[in-house]
């Protein structure tokens, strides 16, 4: 997916979190940080990042895992899980956009309820 398409999707869905797989992708997208007002953090998979380059806006996946371990005792997600309704959005999937901009398709929890 090219940068323009990625930026369109991030703005269209008002993404507040982005996970990138490598430094190349991070370096391609980070210059657009100021154009994505909803984006709060970028999580980078793999090697640790140089936080000084990214002003605290990017964290490494291992840091996310550490935060998860700290939350394990508090169980904040358990309470959120109890409040999920079957008609709420579970996932947002975008089409390829062959005839224009990609279009988002909402997948509800009831669609994947097993």
Question: What positions do the PLM features span?
Answer:
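Short, well-ordered alpha-helical scaffold segments within catalytic/effector domains
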Residues: 3, 26, 74-77, 113
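Conserved pre-ATP/AMP-binding loop-to-beta segment of ANL
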Residues: 58-62, 66-94, 101
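Conserved phosphate-coupling serine/threonine residues in phosphotransfer and NTP-handling enzymes
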Residues: 95-96, 108
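Extracytoplasmic/periplasmic beta-strand context in beta-sandwich domains
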Residues: 40, 103-105
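Conserved structural elements of the adenylate-forming
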Residues: 86, 105-114
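Active-site-proximal glycine-rich helix-loop-beta segment
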Residues: 14, 99-101
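Structural core segment of the AMP-binding/adenylate-forming
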Residues: 1-67
